[in-house]
């Protein structure tokens, strides 16, 4: 006996679909995973097989490869074959469904969905924190969907791993990666296209508001990975408030739309002394950790890189204790370009 779940571009059958469980239930499921450990802070730390996004295993489904120059592609026929392979696998699995919105502005919130094996409930819990959940209807119709099977190999692809992207139908199928970044990126990649179609510019940027004598000013913060984008976004000088950590839409006229109700933060070298806000959010019971070194007594060593420097944590914005709702942020006043590393040439030199 199977259950059925239908979406705009898929019909799935599974042994069960657990739809929109609570955070408490998701955390409990994550703690049952064999590669999960509880920490002394009351949250969960999962060690994954894959510790970063798999760009070499990412392919766009198209019959016009020239239209996607610079990107690896697969044919529509091959995408359908992969879909059939994944659908057959799901038929024997217990799945979790997480519904929500990318963004929270009534004019620009995009209905989104993650469908993933219950065996990897930490990813479901992490995505649930990042989606905006207010006002999700019972008949939720996602514009973007990620169907995620971390335990299904994709034979013949790099590392037997595949992220198959169907831009036309807002659908991403992920096979054989247990890294949360594929869930996050799967939705945001589709959202980027929606922003462009609406005349905006999607930006990999933080956003914060800073009080001044002339009123609050809105800053966008851009920089390559490792230059301090998250750190700069969450610093509290002058009572500034973070709006968004990772992706925003910049619209004509300077209006900013946010994407996520939380943060997927790097934890390597995280210091309570120098980054107290992020440290506090990471070390509280509702956060999820990924690939962070953990001592035998359940404490965390953010400076230990014996497994990876790409340790991560997901936490909700409310864990910060203070933030600015993107709907209330003004139009953009300043753009900050970070170039902390000596080997990085800034995008704008003068």
What spans do the regions from the language model cover?
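Glycine-rich, often acidic-flanked micro-motifs
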Residues: 1-55, 196, 204-224, 234-240, ...
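N-terminal accessory targeting/assembly segments
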Residues: 1-132
């Amino acid at each position: 006996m199977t259950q059925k779940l239908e979406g705009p571009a898929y019909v799935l059958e599974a042994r069960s679909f657990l739809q929109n469980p609570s955070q408490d239930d998701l955390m409990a499921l994550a703690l049952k995973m064999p590669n999960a450990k509880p920490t002394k802070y009351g949250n969960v730390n999962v060690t994954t097989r894959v510790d970063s996004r798999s760009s070499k295993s990412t392919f766009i489904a198209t019959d016009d490869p020239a239209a996607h120059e610079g990107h690896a592609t697969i044919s529509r026929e091959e995408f359908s074959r992969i879909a059939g392979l994944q659908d057959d696998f799901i038929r024997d699995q217990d799945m979790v469904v997480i519904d929500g919105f990318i963004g929270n502005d009534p004019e620009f919130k995009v209905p989104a969905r993650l469908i993933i094996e219950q065996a990897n409930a930490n990813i479901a819990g992490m995505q649930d924190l990042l989606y905006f959940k207010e006002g999700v209807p019972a008949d939720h119709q996602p514009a973007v969907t990620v169907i995620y099977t971390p335990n299904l190999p994709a034979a013949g692809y790099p590392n037997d791993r595949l992220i198959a992207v169907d831009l036309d139908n807002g659908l991403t199928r992920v096979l054989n990666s247990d890294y949360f970044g594929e869930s996050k990126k799967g939705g945001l990649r589709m959202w980027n296209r929606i922003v462009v179609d609406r005349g905006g510019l999607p930006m990999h940027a933080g956003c914060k508001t800073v009080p001044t004598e002339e009123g609050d000013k809105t800053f966008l913060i851009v920089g390559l990975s490792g230059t301090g984008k998250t750190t700069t976004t969450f610093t509290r000088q002058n009572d500034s408030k973070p709006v968004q950590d990772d992706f925003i839409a910049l619209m004509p006229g300077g209006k900013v739309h946010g994407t996520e109700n939380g943060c997927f933060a790097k934890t390597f070298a995280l210091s309570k002394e120098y980054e107290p806000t992020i440290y506090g959010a990471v070390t509280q019971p509702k956060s999820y950790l990924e690939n962070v070194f953990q001592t035998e007594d359940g404490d965390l060593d953010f400076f230990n890189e014996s497994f990876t420097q790409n340790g991560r944590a997901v936490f909700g914005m409310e864990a910060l204790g203070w933030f600015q709702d993107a709907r209330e942020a003004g139009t953009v006043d300043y753009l900050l370009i970070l170039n902390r590393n000596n080997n990085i040439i800034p995008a704008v030199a003068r």
